[in-house]
């Protein structure tokens, strides 16, 4: 099974047949193949949807396109979904995550920035990942023991090298121990079933999710991005754990509609700055984000073995 779109190719043939949803706003689209009963099944996740009496609501808008792989993909993404030509033609560079995870500081970042001069590949971005902030959710409170000169200094040093400056955030997350979670418990999402605070991710020992439909939350997120992009001067944001916003449906909206609302809001507050999505359903950000991480963490060993 899969989500948003899928394609088939008969053995020995070059042509493919693609089935894809135009939008996930109505609800996430699930494609499944039942090999036992020889069935191809298309479902929409509309749990939580509330309609008024007599209201019409389009559930499915599906394209079926057959032909050469490149032509089919162009017709689906550009003509049907409405994606525009990517703003980024080539994105290659450095991220602190895979070498250090959260164990970064100013000395490490500046050392690696200077060391990138020796890279043989074309590099156009240098991205600082998790570990600069005092707590997840308190994005404007830098850990000054690790980064005594602050994050504007880091962005400035990256620009001096001629690279775009990138930084990681999880804008919908609030670490359990963060000031935001303690000061604004009314901002936190709660389970529909029992009203308990919802953990949106397990990072930092657990993090809650702040509700984007609360006006004060939206203002806080706008303030964060204004500081990061316009004061600190970063050019790209890597936005993580975005799925946490749509774990459960609410307010009469499906999970898909909630995620689309969240993605649209992030594009609004980021303007024309680059967005690299991470931990986000891909169908909701096609044509809106500039790029997406599509894999798990890269490591030199397997932490979990199937036995």
Task: List each language-model region with its residue ranges.
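Aromatic- and carboxylate-enriched substrate-binding clefts and catalytic-loop regions
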Residues: 122-307
């Amino acid at each position: 099974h899969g989500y948003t779109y899928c394609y088939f190719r008969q053995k020995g043939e070059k042509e493919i047949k693609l089935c894809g949803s135009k939008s996930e706003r109505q609800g996430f689209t699930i494609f499944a193949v039942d090999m036992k009963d020889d069935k191809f099944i298309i479902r929409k996740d509309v749990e939580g949807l509330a309609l008024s009496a007599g209201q019409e609501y389009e559930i499915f808008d599906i394209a079926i396109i057959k032909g050469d792989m490149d032509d089919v993909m162009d017709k689906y993404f550009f003509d049907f979904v409405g994606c525009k030509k990517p703003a980024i033609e080539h994105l290659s560079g450095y991220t602190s995550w895979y070498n250090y995870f959260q164990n970064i500081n100013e000395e490490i970042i500046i050392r690696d920035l200077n060391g990138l001069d020796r890279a043989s590949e074309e590099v156009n971005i240098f991205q600082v990942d998790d570990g600069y902030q005092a707590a997840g959710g308190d994005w404007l409170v830098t850990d000054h023991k690790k980064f005594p000169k602050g994050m504007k200094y880091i962005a400035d040093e990256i620009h001096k090298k001629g690279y775009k400056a990138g930084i990681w955030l999880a804008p919908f997350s609030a670490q359990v121990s963060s000031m935001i979670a303690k000061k604004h418990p009314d901002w936190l999402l709660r389970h529909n079933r029992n009203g308990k605070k919802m953990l949106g991710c397990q990072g930092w020992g657990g993090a809650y999710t702040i509700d984007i439909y609360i006006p004060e939350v939206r203002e806080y997120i706008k303030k964060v991005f204004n500081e990061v992009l316009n004061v600190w001067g970063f050019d790209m944001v890597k936005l993580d754990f975005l799925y946490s916003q749509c774990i459960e449906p609410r307010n009469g909206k499906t999970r898909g509609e909630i995620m689309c609302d969240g993605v649209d809001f992030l594009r609004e507050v980021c303007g024309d700055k680059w967005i690299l999505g991470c931990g986000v359903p891909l169908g909701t950000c096609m044509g809106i984000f500039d790029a997406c991480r599509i894999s798990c963490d890269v490591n030199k060993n397997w932490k979990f073995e199937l036995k």
